[in-house]
Amino acid sequence: MNKETLDLIKRQLTRVKAADGFYAKRLADIDVDSIKTKEDFEKLPFSEKADLRDAYPLGLAVVPEEEIVRIHSSSGTTGTPVIIPYTQKDVDDWAELFKRCYEIAGITNKDRIQITPGYGLWTAGIGFQLGAERLGAMAVPMGPGNTDKQIKFMQDMQSTVLCATSSYALLLAEEIEKRGVKKKINLKKGVIGSERWGEKMRARIADELGVELYDIYGLTEVYGPGIAINCEHNTGMHYFDDYLYFEIIDPKTGEVLPDGELGELVITTLKKDAAPLIRYRTHDLTRKITGECPCGRKYPRIDVILGRTDDMVKIKGVNIFPGQIDEIIKDVKDASSEYQVFIDHMDGKDRMTVFVETDIVSDDAAKKEFEKHLKTLFKERIGVGIIPKAVAIGDLPRSEKKSTRIFDYRY
């Protein structure tokens, strides 16, 4: 933490303490002037999504209501929503951050950017559009669903960039292949966000669409998508440390971890105007990547999101994250990127059934060997026995939004 970052943090602390909101109460006993080092800052309490829910509807705002130009809300489907207010400065800053993401991906004002994530209260679609407009590129604001229209506009508008969830990008790739229109598609790049995806899925989408792919990261509480993205070298995601301060903590103890160790990402906003966040626990699992990127950019890097602390399932005493399953599937010969895991409890024991798509199901011997290999890898790498099930390509459901991979029916 350099002096400039510390000064920005102290300015934000002063602002939130002066407002009559959540942080004023949480930080009431904190003397801002006493925070002189990184270690002093790390003594401050964390904030959680539950805290933000308790501030509903506008308890996070530290500016007068007349300065709030819009709100967005998290996409969670349970409980009280989290409302994040934005000033015009916040909107402009977000557009600048997203523009940087596009530039890192090699996208220019000559591109035509087809935007398929949702609009409305969600930050997804409008964030992609803000960045496109700031860049000067043509936005094609399709929104989610209506695959027929998506593919028609992709051809008619000769879109060069696809913005989508990985699940929907795969669905579009499969539909384009089925319809035999790949030669009429002019896509060059895909900017993919909103859900974690593995290398096998990345390879399928890149191959079937014939595009370069870029992971984009963000969350509604912190602007939205557009706060980090990988470059052409794909050695982690660059994030913008002039706007955001990242920490990686042990999710159990809250201890700040050394660079390179896997843990939970915690974000402090340095310039957020309407609703600053101090030490916000994202529950996203990643690590800081040290050293200079081959691209030469000075923005620091984190690894791709490997899962969430709340995505973890425990089976027979073993903690399992979706990222671990992705890594296993990647190494299974003839396995597609698509899988689903069902967990239930039978005869006093937990049972884990793993369905994986493959194109060898018509060959009984090959299918049997495939399932045997899958079972062996799970036992060797995670230490859990599974019931392996090979299914045909396309048997598992596709989604226009985020895909659910793990279904736990024990509780």
Task: Annotate each PLM feature.
Residues M1-S73, T78-E96, R100-I104, T108, ...:
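Nucleotide 5′-phosphate-binding alpha/beta core
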Residues D7, M157, I185, Y280, ...:
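Structured loop/turn residues at beta-strand edges in well-structured enzyme cores
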Residues K43, S47-Y214, V222, G226-E232, ...:
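Active-site phosphate/ATP/adenylate-binding loop shared across adenylate-forming ligases
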Residues W197-E292:
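Conserved AMP-binding/adenylate-forming
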Residues V69, K89, D93, S167, ...:
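Conserved active-site and cofactor/substrate-binding residues in soluble primary-metabolism enzymes
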Residues V16, A132, I205, I329-K333, ...:
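Hydrophobic C-terminal alpha-helix "anchor/cap" residues
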Residues L162, K271-I382, K401:
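AMP-binding/adenylate-forming catalytic core of the ANL superfamily
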